Amino acid sequence: MPGRVDILGAGLSGLSAATILARNGYDVHVHEVRQDSGARFDGDFQGIENWTSDVDFFEEMRQWGLDPDEFKSDAFSIVDLIHPDDEITNPITDGVAFRVVERGTDEHCIDQGFKKMALDAGATIHYGTRKEPNECQIIAAGPKDSSAVAFGEIFHTDHENIVAFQLNDKLAPGAYSYLIIIDGIGLICTCLWRQQKKSGRYLNETIAWYEEHYELNRKPIKRVGGKGDFSIPDRYIHDGRHYVGEAGGLQDFMWGFGMRYAITSGVYAAHSIMGQSNYEKKVRNHLVPLIKVSAINRFLMNRLGDRGFKMVANYWMRHQARKGDGLEFMKWVYQPGIFRR
């Protein structure tokens, strides 16, 4: 008989688990220290990748019983790839390369969509409360430490919808910056993997670069920031507790596309508690290989510098010319192989 399940954290991983468990008759209680799901975000845009599986992720969500129509998303098949020497090329695919969603507490945000799914399924969410981890079966709390930081600015603009991704060691040492514009709202963000002095200046210089190369007509709204913790634990079930999402180190080390891993791990944890699968095995077989590859790729990217970034960008475009699909390069980059195990 289904019993009570306590989940620590009302983010995407915790709420995906809560939805499935509640729908299958479990008495689900989600405990969140913040006052709402998505409260740690400031309305910034993030991407859900679509290249680590041959199955479209939204279709996979539907197969699990999760409804991607509960939140706003914008699909992209093309991106501006900005080389270190300011050349701009365009990886493109016939399908969906990734989707952009908004994080936060507004009704259309993905966090609120997952909250609605969990509540509709019958889960109880306790906001503004603390719960001891040893009293929970699923640990879905966000990052506690910070091994990467991001600085961004949200602004009004009359520019068309676009996503631009930039490899430039001077603006984002060892990492990347990006521009996202959705329906008149833009976000310019620089991500830093190395510890830097006066980190704010990198954002200022990044904004200046994008203003010079894109007609943004930018009207600033606010500046935002975020952090991520990237580590690979020894195990994902400890004393009966399932560690999901960032709490379990299930994150994309290379370019920070962690939402797919978060949602997937929450689903795996729910299925494990229901007796349908073994969480430890599912994570190690399906997610850990991707995460290890992304960690090795991040290690290499952190040491390339602009000459290396230029080589990567050029190879990406040559690969697209050969394969006829820019998404194939990203699939290759994330595939475990003999040289990256």
Residue ranges of each PLM-predicted region?
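Glycine-rich FAD pyrophosphate-binding loop
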Residues: 10, 22-44
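FAD/FMN-dependent oxidoreductases across multiple families
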Residues: 73, 199-278
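N-terminal FAD cofactor-binding segment of flavoenzymes
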Residues: 35-84, 151
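Active-site-proximal substrate-binding core of FAD-dependent oxidoreductases
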Residues: 233, 237, 271-309
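C-terminal auxiliary extensions adjacent to catalytic cores
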Residues: 300-341
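Hydrophobic anchor at the start of a short beta-strand
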Residues: 5, 26-28, 137, 152, ...
